[in-house]
Amino acid sequence: MDITRRQAVKSAAFAIGAVAAVPVAARAQDAAGASSQDAVMRTRISNTSPLLLSAVYGNTPDSLWWGNTLEGAWSAVPDDIKPYAAIELHPAKVCKPTSCIPKDTPELRAWYKHMLDEAQLLDIPVFLVIMSAGERQTVPAEWLAEQFETYSVLRGAMNIENYWIYNDDLPTNAAKYLEVCARYGGHFIWHDHENWFWQRVMSNKAFADAAAKYPKNLVIATKNTPIRDDASTDSIVNGMWLTGVCENWGASMDTWKWWEKHFTKPFDAVGTRPRDMRSYASESEAMIACEMMNVYANGGTVYNFECAAYTFMDNDVATPAYLNAIVPFFRFSLNNPAPSRKDVLARTKAVFWEKDGGIDSLPNFYKGLSMDDESLPLYDSGRYHALPVIMNRVDEAAIKGLFPGAAILTKNSS
């Protein structure tokens, strides 16, 4: 990346993080100092070294859901992909009092430790899901630091799916976790959905400042659980990456949206079949790979999947979706690197700047642009790729520096 473009990225990132009135030069000096003290990264993520995450879910204090084992999960990952893979440890049923909501309890900490002990023994790289569903009382940041000090296989922490229950403790706590991850060379990966949600997150001073300090430790990623706003979510996350908020972006492909569409067979008319649990396990395997293509084509480097009994394995047996869609496309991304940030910046012909209002205030903006049904994320990247959405905190000079020659659209554009 040339010096002018690099400076524009830094300026944009600092603009987003600059809630306090601190001079740009001082912020740049502080960031440079923090960067020089960062630990060696535990996982390398880039367009030439993407990351494939595969999830296992907690069942009892010492077991996993769906008959899986940690050893079996790692064995299911092909040897040529293992250097680019890690296992997501999701506590799921271990969470009390509500499944999948990781409130800090002795049982939760014991499960984390049990799984980390096993991962260390078997030398399996893992990420801990420590935030989800708006839970405020998660494990303390310093507890996470202790695990980094104890377990070399711990690669980072994850925050997953809070869009339906936002509260301002989420970004405040996430900032603390991001700082710990940066201290130990880990990644903090945050999967979530909808433009408004990410706007709220970046309006939180603690998180915006942490993101500005530690962009290389932060992965911002989509999570397309509901049947709405896939294109605008891709746009805002892509725009955050292009303006330097995070060094990598990605997605969690969620077949739950198939359930929300009432589908139980490929392309059955909506509503013709019962809305039951068969739905999430019947999204066509190839469509999962198509979703990966959208991420890849727009510079994404982190691939994750919900509904793991369908997208990864059960009873220690890899699923057809994993073997026939996810693995083949991930191999393709290894052999044919996704476009770099420099590549995406250079090819971008237009951006949407939220100076005059958010893109979500324009009903049906995307309808007919890249898709005819925004409830399914198969057409988010059209002929002109994803349209980056730039937060209003980034000034016009920074945008022009990043995207020379690109049209800058706003809500009031003719």
What do the predicted segments below correspond to?
Residues 13-25:
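Sec-dependent N-terminal signal peptides of Gram-negative exported proteins
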Residues 34-414:
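Glycan-processing catalytic domains of CAZymes
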Residues 22-39:
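C-terminal segment of N-terminal export signals and the immediately downstream linker at the start
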Residues 1-16:
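N-terminal secretory signal peptides and thylakoid transit peptides that target proteins
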